[in-house]
Amino acid sequence: MAHGLKVRFWGVRGSISCSGAEYARYGGHTSCLEVTAGGRRLIFDAGTGIRPLGLELARHPEVDIDIFFTHTHLDHITGLTFFQPLFNKRNSVRLWAGHLQGPDTLKQVVSNLMQAPLYPVSLEVFQASVDFSEFICG
């Protein structure tokens, strides 16, 4: 991969994904932005747009990724559970959040999303090396 700057929008919708011909121009996925620079891949938000990004990344034998959450509303995290690189033990995925709302850590937020009755499996199904980190914005 060249070490230039590349930005790709995988999802730009707010609140809820949508489908249909009328959404073809901008797409129907919720928030997900990929930035590659200096040989690194940074992903901002994990809305439904992260699923097709994950399918593309799954073609690589090993990936090293940082995902930053602008905030943890459902439309910014819901695609994380379908992100294929999380299910490959050769991958490293670091999750970062600076705008948590409430007392939960980022790991607790994702764990809460991935539990009954909302989801059939827990975050322990992730096979990649996954790190959860919070930081103070400003």
Question: Model-derived features: where do they sit?
Answer:
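Binuclear metal-dependent hydrolase catalytic cores
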Residues: 1-138
